[in-house]
């Protein structure tokens, strides 16, 4: 228990929260914010807005932060869904005690922003010119319906990279479907090589599909940043978690 307490304390200490959206904007666009301490990582100086709600998007942002990017996690006023995911410190299901949430958001700053309000959307548009990357995991078309989709945000910052990580990608017949972990495994064919021959297939332990989506998202974003630094151009990265799983399944055949 002492080790668990120490770990939770360290994780919490690495997260800085701003709850007032106007304060968020002031801090991100101020000269002081632009001159954040150097992390001496390969992505030092890169600024990222993480709008994701799931494991894959959060893990993508976590990896970018680990490599030195300045990542700000923007959550709805009710908090990101990962806050309600255990295990919890002391077995207390409190939104500030989800060890999973803290682990996925290590090395990030945090703020609340309500994208369902005009004020929140306007603040997001004013923040975008000051960042290099936006990560999101909403249903395809959700942000566009509110006027803050890729086409809307790239109008504010022509070199913006948006990384969208969803169960089935931005296009295609399944794009609007929800996809839980076991669905990603089954449709990505990885369950065809799990379990014992002649018996029912088994789901792998943990959230490997989500981690694969986040890992591919971070790798693709890093490549896009290389292009951005050379050409000044941004792009919209479309990551399908199921396709990431399928790629892994192909590699094991």
Where are these regions (language model features)?
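N-terminal helix-loop segment corresponding to the beta1-alpha1 unit
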Residues: 17-233
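Substrate-binding/catalytic subdomain of NAD(P)-dependent oxidoreductase enzymes
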Residues: 224-253
């Amino acid at each position: 228990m002492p080790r668990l307490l120490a770990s939770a304390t360290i994780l919490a200490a690495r997260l800085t929260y701003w709850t007032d959206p106007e304060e968020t904007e002031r801090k991100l666009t101020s000269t002081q914010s632009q001159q954040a301490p150097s992390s001496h990582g390969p992505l030092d100086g890169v600024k990222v807005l993480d709008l994701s709600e799931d494991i894959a998007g959060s893990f993508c942002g976590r990896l970018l932060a680990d490599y030195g990017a300045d990542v700000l996690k923007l959550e709805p006023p009710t908090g990101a869904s990962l806050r309600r995911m255990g295990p919890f410190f002391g077995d207390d299901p409190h939104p500030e005690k989800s060890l999973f949430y803290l682990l996925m958001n290590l090395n990030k700053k945090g703020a609340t922003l309500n994208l369902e309000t005009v004020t929140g959307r306007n603040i997001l548009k004013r923040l975008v010119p000051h960042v290099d990357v936006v990560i999101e995991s909403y249903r395809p078309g959700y942000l566009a319906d509110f006027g803050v989709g890729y086409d809307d945000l790239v109008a504010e910052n022509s070199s913006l990279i948006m990384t969208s990580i969803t169960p089935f990608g931005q296009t295609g017949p399944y794009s609007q479907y929800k996809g839980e972990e076991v669905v990603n495994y089954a449709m990505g064919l990885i369950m065809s090589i799990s379990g014992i021959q002649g018996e029912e297939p088994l789901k792998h332990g943990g959230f490997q599909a989500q981690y694969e989506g986040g890992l591919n998202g971070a790798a693709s974003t890093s490549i896009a940043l290389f292009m951005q630094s050379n050409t000044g151009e941004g792009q919209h990265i479309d990551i399908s978690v199921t396709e990431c799983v399928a790629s892994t399944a192909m590699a094991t055949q």
